[in-house]
Amino acid sequence: MEMKTINPADTVAELIPGSYYIASPRFAAGADSVVVDVVCHGTCPQASFRTDAVFGVDAAGKPFDVGFRQKFNVGDPRQWSMEGRDEMVYGPDIYALNEALQLEAAAPGPFDMAPSLKNVRITSQKKCRDGRILSEKTVKADNPEFYRLTITPAGVEIEGASRAALAMARRTAKRLFETNPSGVPEAVVEDWPDYPVRGMMIDVVRNFHSLAQMKKIVDGMADLRLNRLQFHLADDEGWRLEIAPLPELITYGSRRGYTTDERLFPAQIYSGAGDPDGELNHGYYTRAEFVDFLRYCDERGITVVPEFESPGHARVAIKAMDFRERTTGDSSFRLHEPADTSRYRSAQQYRDCVLNPALPGPYRFFDVVSDEVIAMYREAGVELPAFHIGGDEVPGGAWSGSPAATAFKAEHGIEDDSGLHAYWVERMAEMMARKGVKIAGWQDIATDYNDSYSARVAPQVDYVNLWVDRNFRKGVKHGSMALRSGFTPLICDFGHFYLDFAHSTHPEEEGLNWGGVIDEFKTLDGYAGNVAPRSDADKTRILGVQGQLWAETLRSDSQMERYLFPRLFALAERGWNADTTFTHGRFNALMGYRELPRLARRGYSFHLRQPGMKLEGNRIVMNSPYADAEIRYTTDGTTPTLSSPLYTGPVEAADPQAVRARLFYHGAESVTTLLPRR
């Protein structure tokens, strides 16, 4: 997007893509108000790039309110796409969907849960009422996460093939008795996962979240028998983990705000008020906090894979090491070449976010970072499953103007920038192999390279995140390519498992939609075996499934939870059970009757589906996706609240287009439903 001032005395400059500063001599005139006229041209590539407001910035870099007011057209609720289509989700379509869901709205049975249990044999109708654990025993089984519950009127006997299996057995027993307060029938439950890894990638870089919130999310993950957290700790916009020998990563890289020169901290991007000391913009985990967090996760059966993006998505690391050089004179960790004239633009529109593999600094940098991370895991007494290097989205031309890269490629017989990227991945794999740790990366480190590269690198790669491309057929090609090359894929495709996507195209829904929209049913339909394998034999090579929660649009802990729940139940189902289990209707009934109320009792926020609405003659009828939820409505075009009339039957309204409805259930509320224009 371009912005220009109309008055030649005013100045406008782009700080970073989509973010500008404006200077005007009138700002110093002491007037009560100032009018600055600007002309904008183009489009923002993603909704997440918009700032929250217009701010003034004082000499210390602190934003202050300038009383900016923008007029919005609120008269037309329709959601227009780039192609000019009305993409609002209207009442009649939702009514039909809710009607279909209610065909299978029977209350769940005592052993219904997500992920669903493999084998339940009810032995009598006698009930166990207190859920007391009578015994725990380790048994041999082909699957290391196999467990068995023997439920008798006296209590529960637990058997499991491993420490992790026993922990999952205890959690399953706890859930059974929480959701069946009158008691659980006498039964034998045998359960095991189809995939060894069932995880979440959580980004705390774009917007920061405390370890207290992360522990709450980990508790929710463990409850659903998820066992892996890919912790996204470094990206273009921030660095969130203390690395003691490189303090600039925190003093510079853990803050973000409005600045014209980025000398003290990076420029503001994504949501937030631009305060470099604000909760979303500023934050990091100390070594001691991270060690404690690793132990917390380990106690709940969750392994943590730390992720530090490279060679792309490295803007903050590059600038933090520039800051180190400016303030200490130490250039040994320089990550880019001052003489580099490369012109490129990343997926996030950055022009300066790729470190240079032809320099010694990046290897020195990651040698120090990885040593510190390994030491933290050793101190915590837990396994480091892999060191995730990112490896994705390196823009074309990133090193085309680098004299060092040109000379390096000639010296090492590297043909192009793709070969230089491959060299980086291989060097990182070798570095970590010397330390006894495998690497992991996004699919970009595994696909479109020759067999010689794959033979050398694949044995040192624990897994690759198969996030697939916009073209699904090409995505299947990448999955097959990764398998054929000897890499182990973790299915993370954006079509089912990007949980920062909006639930629908309704304009009130939170989240991005660059790859479509995803509700819990779309995630439930994310069968890993349909994405990667070339044959049934390849299905055994799939490591599992993983949800992705990118943080560009996350502005609060409660919003994080609304993105996760109830989609996390669907993700857990597909990771535990590779084949069909729930219909949409049965899954929705389980959520409505059991899981959403339980989330509310445990203090989690969650997303709520919306009510349906349609005209029948001169009256408006409404319906709910959940049996016990309340529909509240208005007839004057205003947004319904808890104090609005409760829907109990058909509504007559002089203007049907002015009727609005929302669903309310256990503290949550839906987006607003309305009728289409005639």
Language-model features and meaning:
Residues K438-A446, D451-N618:
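Flexible, acidic glycine-rich loops studded with aromatic residues
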Residues G18, S48-F49, V54-L101:
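Extracellular carbohydrate recognition and processing domains
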